[in-house]
Amino acid sequence: MGAGQSNEHGASSPEELSSVLAERFAAKCFTPLELTHFKDNFFSRALEQGGLRYWNEKVLSDFLGIPDGICTSSPKQPLDAGPVIFRMVSYLGAFPFQNTLAPSVLTFEAMVKVVVLLTERYGKALKRGDKDRIKLLFGSLADVGRKIPAESNKESTTEDSETLVGHSHAPGFSVDEPANDEYDEDEDDDLALAALESLDAIEVFKHDHRVDKTVYETRISIDTFRRLLMLLLVIAPLKPLESLKAYTTGLDARRMESVKKEADSIIAAFTPEESDGGISYKAFARTISLSLPYLFDPLTALFEHMLFSKNLNLSQRSYKGPATETEQEESENEENENKGPPSPPPASLTLPGSFESAILNPTLTSHLSFFLPSTSSDINILRSSVKLHPVFSTAAHGSSLTYFSHHVLTWQSATLLILQGSLADSASEEVITLGAYIPQPWKTSTSTSSLSSKTSDLLPCLFQLSPKHLFLPGNPSSSAKKPNTPTAYFSSNTGIAIGCQIPAPSRTHQTYPTPHGAGSLIIDSNIETAEFHAAPVGHDGVFLPAANASLEDPPTKLKLDLYTLEIWGIVPDPEASFSADPNLSPVEIQRAKWEFEAREAERRRNINIKAGAGDSAAESARWLLETAGIIGDDARYVGGRG
């Protein structure tokens, strides 16, 4: 049965079906008000040629506010992501027929599909719509130059001739040409199948959009990916209605050097093969899905801008016909001249407190947002109301575990441990940044209070940010939750241990935590050195191996001389607080604990004096400090009870 007979819309060609799909997306994925704003944004800026209304790269970049400067030669415009975004949009606009229609002209229908895909709104229209856009995003970034037929002395077969005829009207991207490889991953494009199923056009899909295997053979060039990553790092905190210029203007050379270094650290996680000149699909898919799940979130907020028009904001303007390129430039210049005062600086992720971070900066917090979730839902930490409260810093409080205990154990919420150092016994001064996300409050080893139901599903993670991004996820298996393998362990004698096995105490000698599972971090009792362990195997510990780990890889052991260690308390969303008292924030709870400990210590000291014990002043002072929990050898755990 032909596709035309089975299609209720009477459309049989990819172009017609693509248009019908865009209409369905527009009707089901946007509210009437959003669609009105969308149309105004598009048609008020659209160019026209031969009756076709469209956007070019300049219009797209100008509207979104994406800089088009060359980072190496134009200090005033250090970002150059405009061509990369335009390439991605031209590919996504052809969905679900990238094989024959990409690169697409950016008509209104194409832009509708782009916005639906990048803002993940397609679940409203596609029953089988998988929210994993990884294959589409890879195809939009891969080096996909036009397919050039190879010269051959042999005559083409009938099948080859029919294939060429079927594709002659739109050569498309080579990434979508079929090929014979042996990639063993599920080859079905669920999102494309769902789109065609929704139009009752599966036969057209089978005829024209054969299973794409060449995507597994193409690669993303390092330069292309770096330019995109630099933009994502700069605009990661962007909210849907915020101006991009608040993030992309005023970037000095020092900030851009920091952005480039962070981008290179992320690129290193994809293990790009220099000989092949880029990032493979397999490395891209595994690393994004398991190690950087929120990497493309900034594009969601960026393309939400299409759904709000300043022209319709509390005023009506007469309709203008399609603009020429000259008129478009004049209009943009007029808007720039009449723009209001500059936007206020973006809100900081960190709260004011007892110290300012020597490690966290806007670029590094953007990197954290690519994999750290919010405490309340599956969104990244920058897209929520979560804030970081300064709890402990060696730069501010010194390298004493006494102060560490006093500040950290009284914090009743999740914490972020982050440290910087360099390799011990090495001439290299390269800075290495490590960290751990600990979702439960730190507790004493004798604590019997169970974790709340809201925090029990949150998993810890251990990570390296530089010089190479490495992410070790928490182990969800209940078998990994044992009393002797807590997530975090604290002792004034042995120091701090993350993801280690704790030996039984001995009366004859001092025992020390040992590395266990796929990852662990050990910090000595003077907070001067740290050991980071990562292995490609080990599913019985707190942390699992990294996404791109290979069984052939040797275990990694880094011994660092520490520069700085910081603990940041995570202040949850107000409506989803983990506090026992919903009326108190974690900051207020910590303050109350300090006040209670001080009163309790003073009370017990007075009782001790009245009873006649502790004749010496030194003994009395020690009693006061021990009662307050400031000194002593109590081991401290977090997450050790499962």
Swiss-Prot record:
Residues 149-171, 319-352 are annotated as: Disordered. It is found in: Cytoplasm. It comes from Penicillium rubens (strain ATCC 28089 / DSM 1075 / NRRL 1951 / Wisconsin 54-1255) (Penicillium chrysogenum). Residues 358-571 form the TLDc domain. Belongs to the RTC5 family. The gene is rtc5. Coiled coil: none annotated. This is Restriction of telomere capping protein 5. Keywords: Cytoplasm. Residues 326-335 have a biased composition (Acidic residues). The lineage of its organism: Eukaryota, Fungi, Dikarya, Ascomycota, Pezizomycotina. One of its GO terms (cellular component) is cytoplasm. May be involved in a process influencing telomere capping. The keyword Translocase does not apply. Pfam families: TLD.
